[in-house]
Structure formats: structure tokens, C-alpha cells
Amino acid sequence: LEAMEERQTTIGGTVYPLPNPFLVLATQNPIDQEGTYQLSEAQMDRFMLKDILTYPTPEEEEEVVARIAGGVFDAHPEAGNGQLDTQRVLWLQAMFKRVFIDRSIVRYASYIVNATRHPKNYLEPQLADLIQFGASPRATIALCRAACAHALLEGRPYAVPDDVKAVAKRVLRHRIILKFQASAQGITPEYLIDGILHRVPTP
């Protein structure tokens, strides 16, 4: 948590600053598999996004094998293979900071996050009752930042409501805690997020 929040780590009382750029990627196996443990809400909240990966198609697996055979994943791959170097990443981070997000878009994002805490104002009662805990204020920050990053990837210097919608599930799915009844009924966080996005007015 210290590394993710403060960009430093403390070992034996000595503080070591972490290099820039720095990011944390983690994999999470299904909780029902042996040797897996549920992360706390505070730990999950530190992750900006959560993607869900399925098994690759046969064609994708074939491509993976071909790339391995071609040396794409070697420790010292040849130059010109499309990888980003550190300077390019730092340049993209600088460009990201220049993406404009209007106050109305920030308000829109905050309303979406607030709806996860007060779902009865936005969802049918039987669905609203399935949410045990809504997303924290950190979710609003992450939603706005992810929207700006999406805008940059789309080639725009400003964020629009569609950017917020495009990243909402990735930002919120791990921050909404559902009751056991939701799993029993086959209701997912993504389903509830869709419902909220349909109910929160778009600016």
C-alpha cells in the first residue's frame, strides 16, 4: 500500500523512493481456487482499474506461441518491436496532465460514484438492496483520471461524458461490494453499473 500510495517503500526503517515511471500490475485468481485470499476493500481501492480476462481464442493462443518462438518476449528483444521506452512513457504522462476535464464532467463522475452509495435513488429496490457498500471518494478521482486517459487515447485534448462511460466498469467493478444474495441471483457489479449509467443524467 505504501508503494502504491506514496511511491516509496520502507525496509528496516529506511525509506527507498521508487523510480518514475512506476506502476503496479496484479493478477487475481478466482476466489474459489486453492491458495487465493480475498483482498480487503482498502487494498482493492488502491487499484485504479480492474480488467477481467477470459481464456484466449485458439487463434490468439496460436499467435502467442508464434510470438514466443519469434523472440518477442525475450529478456533483450530487438529494437523496433513497438515497445515503449521510459522516455516515451514519461512523455505520455506529461500529455495526460494536459487533458482538460470540465467541471461538468467531474460532477457527472461524482454523481455516478455517489449513486453506488445511494442506489435506492437510481435503481429498482430489489437491485439497490444488493449493494452492501458503494465506492469511495478515491473512485471519483480514478474515474476522472481514467476518463482523461481515455480521451488522450482517442486523440482528444479534453474529456467528454462518453469517456467516463467507457471506463466506468473498469474503475468501479472492484469498488462496489455486493451482498451474498447478488451472487446467488447472478447479479454482477457490471450489471448494476450499467443500471446506474442509464439513470444518472448525462451532461
Please give the residue ranges for each predicted region.
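Short coil/turn residues that cap or connect secondary-structure elements
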Residues: 13, 35, 97-100, 135, ...
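Conserved AAA+ ATPase small/helical "lid" subdomain
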Residues: 76-121, 125-140
